[in-house]
């Protein structure tokens, strides 16, 4: 009996959370380390260890929250598996040779998309069984559905890959907690778009087209179920331009909904005022793994911060109409190589961060999102009133 306990304890130690590492730590992993992206949670890790032939270490990526059959939002499988395939290919591009998707028994990605059979592992899972629960529940109709999207990407030498996901999840939950009758936060999506993926190790990339197709399909499904107010909330700058396209597509396809997004959190009138009030770095000190993001993490997950490794990176190639700060300045939009401006992956002055700043900025970010939710409700209600009254061309359509 003692030996079996030792064996179980040893097995539990072989698993590590990929997104809690820094990018240099990922770069140092042996390239034959198995990396597993699970669809949902609740799998048997002892069984998984056996399925992988009991390797010395296994990296568990953040669980993908929904999209497969039985998850509560069932997307067309070609759209869903394109997203998954792009994520797995990000790991392969980094040189990893044992990359897997862990999925419920009964899914057959080969039947609808060319996902190699060697790329997936199946186990019994709750989402394989009836009755299935819709996500969000139909009882939540009439609320603004908050859709937080983070990312899994490098954040310099001192922060984990999960920074964007931790921050936006906390903001979305905070907003929903303050107005439970007016909004509902969806499970956070930990994977977005990084067009600079190849510059530093460990950065994932869902791909712009797959990202757009996935989220437009989500809106299609939720609208068909009677939801009509949506707010895409991004914790990652690389998602922004694609989210603009998504809300435009959604508005064109569904004329009686109100689907919105915004630039990064803590960047509207409330957030910007709080940044200006509490920051100690100059312009250029807030961009990525910076004073702002590091402060958030010191407040929310200090156990994942390695402040002894902080390197301030403020040598951005700046001109009057193109420079880096949290609220980007200038009229030019561009996408030069990330490593033109950063040696470590960071943009900004992480050494200025404190947990107290993180607390204050989180409060401001939540207040800002609560304000946005109220505006989304007002926009939808006033527009519906006009439509129902036959305003302009609406009078010819009714």
Placement of each model-derived feature along the sequence:
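Extended, histidine- and acidic-residue-enriched regions that form the cofactor-binding/catalytic faces
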Residues: 1-231, 235-398
């Amino acid at each position: 009996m003692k030996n079996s306990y030792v064996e179980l304890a040893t097995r539990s130690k072989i698993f590590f959370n990929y997104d809690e590492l820094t990018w240099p730590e990922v770069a140092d992993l042996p390239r034959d380390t198995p990396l597993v992206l699970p669809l949902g949670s609740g799998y048997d890790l002892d069984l998984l260890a056996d399925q992988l032939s009991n390797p010395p270490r296994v990296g568990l990526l953040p669980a993908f929250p929904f999209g497969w059959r039985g998850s509560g939002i069932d997307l067309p499988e070609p759209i869903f598996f394109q997203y998954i395939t792009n994520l797995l290919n990000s790991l392969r591009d980094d040189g990893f040779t044992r990359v897997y998707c862990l999925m419920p028994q009964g899914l057959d990605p080969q039947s609808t998309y060319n996902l190699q059979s060697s790329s997936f592992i199946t186990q019994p899972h709750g989402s394989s069984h009836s009755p299935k629960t819709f996500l969000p529940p139909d009882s939540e109709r009439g609320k603004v559905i908050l859709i937080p999207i983070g990312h899994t990407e490098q954040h310099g030498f001192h922060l984990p890959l999960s920074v964007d996901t931790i921050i936006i999840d906390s903001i979305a939950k905070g907003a929903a907690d303050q107005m439970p009758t007016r909004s509902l936060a969806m499970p956070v999506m930990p994977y977005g778009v990084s067009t600079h993926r190849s510059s530093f190790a460990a950065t994932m990339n869902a791909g712009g087209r797959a990202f757009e197709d996935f989220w437009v399909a989500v809106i299609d499904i939720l609208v068909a179920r009677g939801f009509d107010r949506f707010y895409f909330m991004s914790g990652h700058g690389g998602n922004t331009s694609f989210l603009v396209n998504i809300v435009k597509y959604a508005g064109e396809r569904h004329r009686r909904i109100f689907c919105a997004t915004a630039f990064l959190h803590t960047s509207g009138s409330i957030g910007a005022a709080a940044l200006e009030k509490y920051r100690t770095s100059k312009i250029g000190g807030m961009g990525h793994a910076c004073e702002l993001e590091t402060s958030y993490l010191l407040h929310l997950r200090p156990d994942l911060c390695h402040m002894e490794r902080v390197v301030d990176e403020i040598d951005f190639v700046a001109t009057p109409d193109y420079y880096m700060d949290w609220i980007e300045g200038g009229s030019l939009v561009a996408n030069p190589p990330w490593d033109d401006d950063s040696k470590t992956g960071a943009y900004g002055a992480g050494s200025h961060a404190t947990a107290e700043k993180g607390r204050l900025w989180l409060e401001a970010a939540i207040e800002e999102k609560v304000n946005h939710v109220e505006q989304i409700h007002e926009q939808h209600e006033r527009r519906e009133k006009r439509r129902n009254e036959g305003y302009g061309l609406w009078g010819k359509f009714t």
